[in-house]
């Protein structure tokens, strides 16, 4: 007896053997199948081909194929092709009859292979179907069908007929009532030698390279009128008093293309000519932006034609521009012309075509000229912006100081140049005056003095009686010190300027005590003549007797007396009124301030009493 484990082992071995046998069988079948396909592909050119189909009739056309020699069973498939259906393959028991193309009699009872010439092989409509086991016939590929249709004799005739039909139907190659193709214009050839642009208004002009040439682009604001003036260089050829002027808006491209629109025209204009007809001024408004048209620039094309000039409309008919002063309305423009010496033209282009000839009418014998390139913006502020989109960097405090210092240095240079010129005119050598920069200690010392640091004169300087210092003092004041201090050498100009500025502010923030004015010092500094004048002025004053009596009684008045009826203050006030040149603090202001202070203290005391 076999154990259970041995039985399981045997069953596993049998299953493995069966699996290997099945894989071997499938591999052999696939190898045989591939070998048969390779032989079939090698024998495809030797297989019988079909004869070309008869003239187009609703008949069944049998198609027969010869079986391969290596196949186990020979099969004959016949496909019957009609205009609407396709039949299944027939059996071997039926005998098909084929009609050879060479005119021989057909044989019955067997399938006759048809050997075609290379020309006939290329002219077969239906391609051969390769043998594939367990598969149906597939439709021919479109590439083979296209090539076969193009080489079939019947199809060649059909193609010739189609070509003949297209040649007879094409309206553009034959002459007749059809309109001619619209011409294309370029900016280099459109300008007339008899016209010239003499003025074009704009809010600003910028230089731009267009078609490898430098051009001045005129910037205008949307829906804002500007004037375009043109001039005739030959009045015998062009006279604006007897001409019709039209204008249109075009892109700055090659070839020129008109700006298309749906309902509202992009340009409106009013024109007028001078008395002799030499110049013509056009007041133009543009209602579109350059940003709305991908940033394109615009031209204004002005076309001038005689009054009786024939023009071709969009329908292909000829139209004559009227010579009278009446208003005429057409599909492209509305113009008013006058035969007098002064003519006015009002035009609003309403054409919806993008061809250059639509708005201009047809240019038969007319002359045209282009304006300068135009860029249309919505606001004047947009001109100041950088077109490259570079934002302005925010300046720091140090940057602002350096800018101010640079401007001050420029002013210093210009002023020094003016001073040197003045010295040369007066014959004074420049070597005696050295206008150099001040050092920091000098700036600090000048801040405490009464004179500004920029003035070459000092009040405290010991000069002559007139207060004018000597020349040596000026030179000493302005000469640069020989021993330069090393303070601040490693710092930049902005930091040194900031430190000096802070020091000046500290000086002005300090609280100074009240300085009393001493009359004795003032009187001692006067000459005899000045003292006599002062005595005469004092004698002319009139004083009240009460004040004199009080002055005799009150002998304890000091210089800083705060009495309201002090005689010294009254005399000082009268003296100050007669001598406005001398500037010193007014005692009247002092007294008023003191009275105000006393009143305020009294009020506060009263308030405190009431609250208690």
From Swiss-Prot:
Q: Where is this region: Disordered?
A: 46-113, 129-185, 313-360, 457-488, 593-612
Looking at the UniProt record for this protein, which Gene Ontology cellular component terms does it annotate, in alphabetical order?
A: nucleus
The record, for InterPro entries, names: CudA-like (IPR040430)
| Start-end of Polar residues biased regions | 103-113, 129-138, 175-185
**Where do the TM regions start and end?**
none
Where does the record place Low complexity bias? 58-102, 143-169, 323-359
Mind listing the GO biological process terms from this record? Answer: positive regulation of DNA-templated transcription; sorocarp spore cell differentiation
Molecular function as annotated in GO:
DNA-binding transcription factor activity; sequence-specific DNA binding; transcription cis-regulatory region binding
Lineage, top-rank taxon, reads Eukaryota
Protein name, UniProt field: Uncharacterized protein DDB_G0287317
């Amino acid at each position: 007896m076999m154990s259970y484990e041995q039985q399981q082992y045997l069953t596993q071995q049998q299953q493995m053997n069966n699996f290997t046998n099945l894989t071997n069988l499938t591999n052999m079948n696939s190898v045989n199948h591939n070998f048969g396909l390779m032989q079939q592909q090698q024998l495809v050119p030797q297989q019988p081909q079909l004869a070309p189909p008869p003239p187009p009739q609703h008949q069944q056309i049998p198609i027969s194929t010869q079986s391969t020699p290596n196949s186990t069973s020979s099969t004959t498939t016949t496909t019957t092709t009609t205009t609407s259906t396709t039949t299944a393959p027939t059996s071997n028991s039926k005998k098909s009859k084929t009609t050879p193309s060479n005119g021989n009699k057909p044989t019955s009872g067997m399938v006759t292979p048809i050997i075609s010439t290379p020309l006939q092989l290329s002219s077969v409509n239906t391609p051969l179907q390769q043998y594939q086991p367990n598969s149906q016939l597939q439709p021919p590929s479109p590439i083979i069908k296209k090539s076969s249709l193009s080489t079939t004799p019947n199809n060649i005739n059909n193609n010739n007929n189609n070509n003949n039909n297209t040649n007879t139907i094409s309206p553009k190659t034959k002459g007749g009532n059809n309109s001619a193709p619209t011409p294309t214009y370029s900016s280099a050839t459109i300008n007339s030698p008899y016209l010239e642009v003499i003025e074009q208004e704009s809010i600003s002009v910028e230089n731009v390279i267009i078609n490898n040439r430098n051009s001045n682009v005129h910037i205008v604001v949307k829906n804002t009128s500007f004037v375009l003036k043109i001039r005739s260089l030959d009045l015998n050829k062009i006279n604006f008093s007897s001409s019709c002027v039209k204008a249109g808006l075009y892109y700055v491209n090659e070839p020129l293309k008109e700006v298309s629109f749906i309902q509202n025209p992009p340009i409106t204009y009013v024109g007028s000519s001078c008395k002799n007809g030499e110049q013509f001024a056009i007041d133009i408004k543009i209602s579109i932006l350059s940003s709305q048209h991908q940033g394109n620039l615009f031209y204004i094309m002005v076309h001038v034609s005689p009054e009786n000039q024939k023009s071709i409309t969009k329908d292909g008919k000829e139209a004559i521009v009227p010579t009278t002063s009446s208003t005429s309305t057409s599909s492209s423009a509305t113009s008013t012309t006058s035969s007098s010496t002064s003519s006015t033209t009002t035009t609003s282009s309403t054409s919806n075509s993008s061809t250059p000839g639509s708005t201009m009418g047809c240019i038969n014998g007319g002359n045209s000229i282009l304006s300068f390139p135009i860029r249309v913006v919505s606001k004047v502020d947009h001109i100041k912006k950088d077109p490259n989109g570079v934002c302005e960097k925010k300046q720091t405090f140090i940057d602002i100081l350096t800018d101010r210092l640079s401007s001050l240095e420029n002013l210093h240079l210009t002023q020094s140049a003016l001073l040197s010129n003045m010295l040369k005119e007066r014959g004074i050598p420049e070597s005696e005056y050295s206008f150099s920069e001040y050092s920091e200690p000098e700036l600090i010392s000048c801040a405490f003095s009464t004179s500004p640091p920029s003035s070459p004169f000092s009040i405290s300087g010991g000069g002559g009686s007139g207060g004018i210092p000597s020349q040596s003092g000026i030179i000493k004041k302005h000469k640069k010190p020989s021993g330069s201090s090393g303070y601040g050498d490693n710092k930049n100009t902005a930091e040194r300027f900031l430190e000096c500025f802070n020091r000046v502010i500290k000086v002005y923030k300090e609280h100074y005590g009240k300085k009393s004015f001493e009359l004795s010092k003032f009187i001692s500094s006067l000459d005899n003549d000045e003292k006599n004048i002062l005595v005469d002025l004092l004698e002319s004053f009139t004083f009240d007797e009460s004040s004199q009596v009080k002055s005799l009684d009150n002998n304890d008045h000091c210089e800083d007396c705060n009495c309201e009826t002090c005689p010294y203050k009254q005399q000082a006030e009268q003296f100050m009124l007669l001598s406005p040149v001398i500037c010193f603090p007014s005692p009247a202001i002092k007294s008023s301030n003191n009275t105000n202070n006393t009143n305020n203290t009294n009020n506060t005391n009263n308030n405190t009493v009431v609250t208690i």
